Amino acid sequence: KKGVTQREDDRTFPCNSGRCACQPLDSYSYTCQSPSSSTANCKNNVCVSEADW
């Protein structure tokens, strides 16, 4: 599992195009998932798309 450093979080979208970045409630690093996946485990119930990053 590849982690994303905090330094990169501010600048570079951490996921592949077409996917979204979910910040798990118990973690500071983002995980990437399909936009159609549930966001129940994501902070603020949000999975951030590349356009919204």
UniProtKB/Swiss-Prot annotation:
Residues 1-6 form a propeptide. Expressed by the venom duct. This is Conotoxin Cal9.2e. It is found in: Secreted. The keyword Transcription does not apply. GO terms for molecular function: ion channel regulator activity; toxin activity. Disulfide bonds join 15-32, 20-42, 22-47. One of its GO terms (cellular component) is extracellular region. Keywords: Disulfide bond, Ion channel impairing toxin, Neurotoxin, Secreted, Toxin. The keyword Secreted applies. Signal peptide: none annotated. The cysteine framework is IX (C-C-C-C-C-C). Probable neurotoxin with unknown target. Possibly targets ion channels.
